[in-house]
Amino acid sequence: MKRILLTMAALVLAGTGLALSAQETETPEYSYKQTGFMSTPKVGGYIIGSYKYSDQDGAHNGPGFNCRLIRLYVDGSIFNDFKYRIQFQANGNPHVKDFYIEWAKYKEFSVKVGQFKRAFTFENPMNPWDVGVGDFSLLVQKFAGMGDRLGEANMGGRDQGIQIQGDLFPIGDAQYRLIHYQLGVYNGQGINLADANGAKDIIGTLQIQPLQGLYLGAFAWKGDWVNNAGETLKRQRLNFGMKYDKDNWTVRAEYATNIRGEKSQTGAADAFYATVGVPVMDWLKIYAKWDELRDNDVRHDMYSACANFRLHKNLNFQLEYRYHNNKFAASPKYNEIWAMAYIRF
């Protein structure tokens, strides 16, 4: 972990130094009377509705019609350097999902503080619109905090803390960035909760973009979580993955595993998924996905095919078939059909 942090620090200093020497900007006047240099706040949201059929024993062919998500957000910028965002979830148990301010003057180095996505896995930071299938992978759910394997409730892959990130070394005719990094310090308890033990989680990633649109990345997480019984459970995890998104083609694959203290405390666990998205027409894209979770020698495999009918940037319909071989369930083999409607405003 120390070697990773030192390497990332050296890259940040090198990349930021180059940017500062090459960039001259006009500094606005800072004053408590200043009212300019502020964007009009953008207000928006989206709704995801669904119908789900399952032939799993005890599912009663359900759950049927459901509202998966209603999200509302406000974002904007001040001085073009400071960005802010507040996001609410309106359905189910309404709550604040994101709130943060980010100093983002330079692409090479920015600082974000508040409540936001953990910097763990490629898929976790993605918007549900961009995942390609009806839900996040088992890997993200159990290893990034969407119903964690340790028993933490679904925190949407988020926590409260501070994070630095940036993109370094533009290369090629397109001047795409060779290296992306993120390093964050978090409470460890998830959203809308205070730190329970004074310790902090450290999560970081280092990613390389050797070709435009292709990222190879490694992620590390060292921390702990305090459950409702007051027990402190270690979270020590690694993740390795790749993603390719260009010209509407998508390939994404990741592998995550627990290590050291978490492995010895709660048993060995790992997960893997692979997703391929193929554009058929401008409005039709087909995804195929293999999703696997192993926890203490119990295994859940899920295979799916999903058609996305993207009729508009802000309108999408999905039809997905899922086959499960889930040894965590009493009747492991079952089929599901999901139909989803996405609308954004």
Give a label for each model feature.
Residues 29-188, 196-202, 207-216, 275-278, ...:
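Outer membrane beta-barrel
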Residues 309, 333-345:
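Outer-membrane beta-barrel "beta-signal"
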Residues 92, 244-248, 345:
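A generic beta-sheet turn/junction motif
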Residues 277-327:
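C-terminal hydrophobic structural anchor segments
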Residues 1-48, 345:
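N-terminal periplasmic/intermembrane-space "pro-region" immediately following the signal or transit peptide
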Residues 207-296:
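Detector for outer-membrane/organellar transmembrane beta-barrel domains
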